[in-house]
Amino acid sequence: MEMAPCLWLLLSALIQLSTSQRSEPMFSSVTKTVLQPDYENNPTQLNYGIAVTDVDGGGDLEVLVAGYNGPNLVLKYDQRRKVLHNIAVDDRSSPYYALRDRQGNAIGVTACDIDGDGREEIYFLNTNNAFSGLATYSDKLFKFRNGRFEDLLSDDINVRRDVANRVAGRSVACVDRKGIGRYSIYIANYANGNVGPHSLIEMDEAASDPLNGVIALHNMAEEAGVNKFTGGRGVAVGPIISQTLPDIFCDNEYGPNFLFKNNGDGTFTDIAAQAGVDDPHQHGRGVALADFNRDGKIDIVYGNWNGPHRLFLQTNANRKQRFKDIATQKFAMPSPVRTVIAADFDNDQELEVFFNNIAYRGSSANRVFRVSRREHSDPLIEELNVGEAAELDGRGTGAVVTDFDGDGRLDLIVSHGENVAQPLSVFKVNPGSANTWLRVIPRTKHGAFARGAKVVAYTKKSGPHTRIIDGGSGYLCEMEPVAHFGLGRDVATSVEVWWPDGKSVARPLTTSDMNSILEIPYPVDEIPVPESVEIECGHGFAANENGRCIDKDECTQFPSVCPRDRPVCINTFGAYKCRPNKRCGHGFEPNEDGTACVAQVAYFGGSPSSSSSCLVGVHYVSIALLGLACLL
């Protein structure tokens, strides 16, 4: 007996609805065993941003926590006791004592090497007594000097320069804007009228003497073209549009987002509207960068405060760099979101997106989605069972991923605050324990973590996987400076690292490199690949004479790889597409698949139309008579 089609549809919908509940829980809490709440190590206080760096210079990664109504924390993992403990203790003789900064209301935190000494400085953004505009207490920029951490912004030379940020801000991030291996601190300030533009603090090389500990700072935001006034919220940095130089994406509140494209000289131009990511009527929060469909282009995922969340896939239709929102209805469901993280938690090759929500006017569970690549189609997005990381009543304010215990599986740390003091939460991942993994740590020419570098792992079966070494993302946070690759049952055959200045290294891999951590130093000279080494690049790629995996251009083959009814061959990253020979009239162009004609970028009143409206003040309008279509 056959089942009626409508019943099949109903059954399919019910199965899909229950998938996230039936699947194995992604996260289990280990807070009680790894970071037991107590006054010294995990105090019940208001916390916000979290960052990961090597604080003590010992080679392992520590976790920095921005304390708002309590001290900042520095959590180090004790391999013997299997616990995280705070090394920034209340003892003035401790080299980490200054990092506590008990007087500051810290909200954002980031770390990077600003002076080229090979060790990362630590920046805490404070928002004392201010939601926007001027604050009553300045930010702190800590450098390890004279055997302890000291605040550079308090040095006489910088006090005279009046460089300290005294404006209420939100996120901070690190950007090597010129590709020189020294970083600037990008500060997403929350402006009040014409008070509090975004800032960009970096070392003034001409006035500094790093060998003697003299670091003169200046604000280069105006010269770089990023001194914008807005309600700054989230920031993410990496080669989004550029090949290797870092671009900057900011999702903002009460104003359009920014996508600052690097002009190649360390200055930036905002192209958010042209690229379709300005989202002017929403209020951004957490943001992350990732290559979800493994096409070599960097995509943007972010959450809007009680608005639709976005998953912007980068396209290159007709040689124009644009983004399209592929978020499903469930993925986009509005929530009081804070942090957004993109990572392969279960090491199955596919990326997950974690939404950290704050219990705002009632419970609001955290959520996690898997974004799975599909050939010649947008990725499949499915909600997973978030498990004990749901935290229905958690006042989530920040979160990071890092492998603090060295088992090759990412750990999740969540902070809480806002209006209810809660301790930190720590979660381990349940599924994927048998999956293969690879972790890559590139270094700058000075030996520091190469934040903003692009790392590509080529595999035997699943093509290339791309990661950006994080310089700030999530929301108020900064992830570990590691390219973490989950490989499932696959094997990585080659890894390439691209530094912001365009330098690159290709390293062939063997099976013995799997389940390990690779440190990749900055290339002083070109390192040739031995002729005896045969590199497998996977389907759609081939090794060139320099041992680099490059895309095969199937469209140059003879006879043609495309059939007669779809004769136009379009080479894609690791593959190709065949489409009809569509011809379009003036003002129109073929869509990405060549199946229809769409309007070219339209102009109304002398300015480009936004990605979310066809006419100013008119939304979701179809102008059928003109043959124009709006991509909503």
Predicted regions and their residues:
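Repeat-based blade/solenoid architectures
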Residues: 32-50, 68, 92-110, 156-174, ...
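Acidic/hydrophobic-patterned starts of short beta strands in beta-sheet-rich repeat architectures
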Residues: 57-67, 116-126, 179-188, 242-251, ...
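N-terminal entry motif of extracellular EGF-like repeats
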Residues: 535-561, 580-604
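Beta-propeller blade repeat segments, especially FG-GAP/WD-type strand-to-loop junctions
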Residues: 19-29, 71-89, 133-153, 195-220, ...
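Cleavable N-terminal signal peptides of Sec/SRP-targeted secreted and luminal proteins
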Residues: 4-20, 619-630
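C-terminal GPI-anchoring signal of eukaryotic secretory precursors
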Residues: 601-620
